[in-house]
Amino acid sequence: MEKYIGKSVYKGTAIGPVSVLKKKDSLVKRIHIDNTAEELKRLDAAKEHTMTQLGQLYEKALQEVGEVNAAIFEVHQMMLEDDDYQDAIHSMIQNEEVNAEYAVAVTGDNFAEMFANMDDEYMQARSADVRDISNRLVRNLSGEEQIDWSTMEPSIIVADDLTPSETVQMDKDKVLSFVTVHGSLNS
């Protein structure tokens, strides 16, 4: 039996089987694009699809965890529509003639790094939000399927980190507890 020591966010004890969530890192390739106008249209369609998904997550979270906690998905929508974020992606596609997935991944990494290097702990935690939004947008661009949480058995979820969008998609009756390596009280 292995024993780990950590900081608890909530009081209580959970006993049950453990499900380890291992995320696969998507390797995003840089591909030269001749028709940047078509690539921007593809980006805009994926952005709209992502906005719809975030709206659905907001509605689900609103029902399950209340308005205060659901608000993170409105923040995600605002981040996705942020002019600086969108301008950086568009500029990269137009100026470097690269595929949208690559432009989103690079821009997301740059913005996430900027947040991670801020002095304020709350703002540092937004780094994970930028990565979550960017990863969702890349998945939508590439047609990669989202994780199907409906088949999950009741268990203690162990992961390096969990995003708000991952946790709200899980069936709360099947989650006994969360154990994460990364994250903070502000995440």
Regions found by a protein language model. Give the residues of each.
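Non-catalytic, soluble scaffold/interaction modules
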Residues: 1-187
